[in-house]
Amino acid sequence: MQNIDLISEEEAQKLLEELADKIAAYNHAYYIEDNPLVSDSEYDQLFNTNLKLEQKFPHLILENSPSKKVGAKIANKFAKVTHQVPMLSLSNAFDEQDVRDFVDRIKIFLRLNEFAPIFCEPKIDGLSFSAVYKHGVLTTGATRGDGYVGEDITANIKTIKNFPHKIDNVPEFLEVRGEIYIEKQDFLNLNKEQDEQGKDKFANPRNAAAGSLRQLDSSITAKRPLKYFVYSGGVTEQNLASSQDQLLTKLKECGFNINEISKLASSEEEIFAFYEYLKTNRENLPYEIDGVVYKLNDFVLQNRMGFIARSPRFATAHKFPAIIGQTKLLSITVQVGRTGTLTPVAELEPIEIGGVTVSRATLHNFQEIARKDLRIKDYVFLQRAGDVIPKIMGVDFDKRPNDTETFDTPLFCLSCNSKLHYTPEDIIIRCDNGLNCPAQNYERIRHFVSKNAMDIEGLGRKQVEFLIDKGLISNPLDIFFLKEKNDSSLAKLENMDGWGKKSVENLFKNIEKSKNVSLPRFIYALGIRHIGEQNAKLLAREFGSYNNFIAQMELLRTNEPDIYQKLNNLEGIGDKILVDIIDFFDVKENIELIKKLGGILNIEDYKETREQSSLTDKIVVFTGSLSTISRAEAKATAEKLGAKVAVGVSSNTDLVVAGVGAGSKLKKAKELNIKIIDEEEWLTLIKNV
């Protein structure tokens, strides 16, 4: 990663665009697929790089910035549940200084002279949930989803042992929030069962819990050893108590499981002592934790602090350092992705780290092998922080055997044997043989049918590989003629190994169902390099319909300057991504394939809905000193209500809030005849919005 202090504005823009796409993909894999692609520590590093870039270049903040989002958009297989109060994620603290900064921000924001008590509790590594009770009866259970809309898992949550279905002496409407998890030993037992039944094993306890809870068949969920803790009252918590410690006491009285390991800290020293206690004893706990959560204990102060786009100001998560292990590097294999990128993967002697058996680790690129001087048969240090594929941190050179073997970077593609192309600025090696490369073609079809693309259930890795090997499909278009081909063939698919009448019927139904697709999903399904879900949405928003999209892309092939400029001006589409789009549509076969797909699919026009309020999109300027609230709190409230807060007055300004000692900005607002109100009027206004 580049040095943020030395980065230019142009480089920052490109990096922000890349980070937005990467983090969106990682969010989807983690929250929706229950299949994280990178370690927690690597994700945190990317996210913090994004934040630092935005702090240095605030004018470059993208519409699809990760700092504005929580989780990922929910899948289509569950009914949707809208959270009355968003289920946001927490900001992270990685060391004691970060925690001190968190405490200082509270003091400054609230204008406090003394330490405000902080409630400390373990950060459970599970799946967040919300449960709603009406007249004491459980009516709705939901996942976090994207923070605003989650998945309805009511039937599944009712199968969890000791989860209350009915409670007494509570308000007419009650919400609780918490974490659903699987204990370490239960996870090992579950994986043993999966292995004995020939099913894929779960990567870690969190994945197992998430996968179990997101089953369409609740009888499967009922067989899984799920447990839970509640830690919040959601929209109703302030009807139950005035502080976090009182709330947990009340929820326990109602019959909910709460985590008894907690601490109400009265100083920074007490915070750090509790953190060290948990860090030292985490391996002795029956469940996985990945840090400690700190919250302002007082709900009145929490309300005043409020939220930023994706997290509350009044809470943070102090993360534990990653778990380190050591094992032997047995070999290095190479994978070819759908865009031709070659990725080396370390094959390891299996090792258990934090209750999970690890046998593979990502090496990211071939330069990393040389930089770390990795050799086959070396003993390597492995880092795991709740991830699926951990990261190799380095070599134990003191234990290096005499018979180690260096790894030779391939010159030819392992799939199609074509000469490889090396791109120094991307630090990657690529096969440019496109769809003539079997590995790329396979991965492209796999991407096309994936959940967040065309979402064709029943076409997993094994099924796609089988259909290609049998010559039944060779490109995405063939999928939609599979039933027709099967009906006219003597060798029926349902009679072949691994298939059956029911599975084939379901597959054909799912293929037919997928023909109705939104424009953003369709664009994403095409597999254009660097066009993830967010950038696909940007393109869909710009062009509106499939017909306009394909027409404009054909113009792009003819070097039409207007369309080039239009794409170049899109926030989130930089020069690098634009080149990738041009390269994709320069291939005649790609245009032909898209047109044929457009002829058989119902591709819905792009639609976007936005909630409106009286302050939405209004430009507000604060000037002078405010007596009852801090400037930061006033700004946060305005943004929460949809306003855009500016630092200077211009003809575009809609409202000026003038405090004591307002000067030049107030004068200019009067000259421009802009509406001006004082602090008291502002407080009345926001109360009534």
UniProtKB/Swiss-Prot annotation:
GO terms for cellular component: cytosol. It holds the Pfam family DNA_ligase_aden. The keyword Ribonucleoprotein does not apply. Keywords: DNA damage, DNA repair, DNA replication, Ligase, Magnesium, Manganese, Metal-binding, NAD, Zinc. One of its GO terms (molecular function) is DNA ligase (NAD+) activity. It catalyses: NAD(+) + (deoxyribonucleotide)n-3'-hydroxyl + 5'-phospho-(deoxyribonucleotide)m = (deoxyribonucleotide)n+m + AMP + beta-nicotinamide D-nucleotide. The active site is at residue 123. Residues 610-689 form the BRCT domain. Belongs to the NAD-dependent DNA ligase family. LigA subfamily. This is DNA ligase. It comes from Rickettsia africae (strain ESF-5).
